[in-house]
């Protein structure tokens, strides 16, 4: 039982398959793309998982095991608001079969942190155009129209 622990805990990928039962006592599982953000994040009633960018099969299987054993949990993903962040989220949804919702990867967040956004490169535009007809259409259209992207490290959660 880890519910009373404060702070981070690391579990080796090598033992994830050996874990038989995972009971999440909070309401949410939140996956995070970047390590800096993971270390600085506290999200009440959430089990937070660091993905390290593109997730591997071991992490995906662990997440699927959590979903199977905790069917009422909400799954969120917090990543960069750029083409890479949305590709990671789309890949996570496809490979796990879980309906992850983007967390703070929206127009409101881009507007709030406008001073920290960066301009899109030509490659960013190409990649975003390929994603524009996905479930993330609203934020991607905004990014293309306003020539902006945002690293998740600029966003304050705590």
Task: Show the residue positions of the predicted features.
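Acidic beta-strand-to-loop metal/phosphate-binding motif
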Residues: 73-82
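Conserved beta-strand segments of alpha/beta enzyme cores
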Residues: 47, 99-101
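Nucleic-acid enzyme cleavage-core boundary/entry regions
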Residues: 1-50, 55-69, 84, 91, ...
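RNase H-like polynucleotidyl transferase catalytic core
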Residues: 101-107
């Amino acid at each position: 039982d880890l519910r009373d622990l404060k702070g981070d805990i690391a579990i080796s990928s090598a033992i994830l398959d050996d874990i038989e039962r995972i009971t999440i006592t909070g309401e949410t599982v939140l996956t995070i793309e970047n390590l800096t953000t993971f270390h600085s994040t506290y999200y009440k009633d959430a089990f937070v998982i660091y993905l390290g960018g593109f997730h591997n099969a071991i992490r995906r299987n662990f997440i699927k095991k959590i979903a199977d054993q905790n069917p009422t949990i909400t799954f969120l993903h917090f990543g960069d608001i750029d083409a890479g962040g949305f590709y990671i989220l789309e890949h996570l949804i496809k490979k796990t079969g879980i309906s992850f919702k983007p967390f703070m990867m929206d127009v409101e967040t881009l507007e709030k942190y406008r001073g920290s956004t960066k301009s899109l490169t030509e490659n960013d535009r190409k990649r975003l155009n390929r994603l524009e007809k996905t479930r993330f259409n609203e934020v991607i259209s905004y990014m293309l129209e306003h020539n902006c992207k945002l690293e998740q490290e600029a966003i304050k959660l705590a």
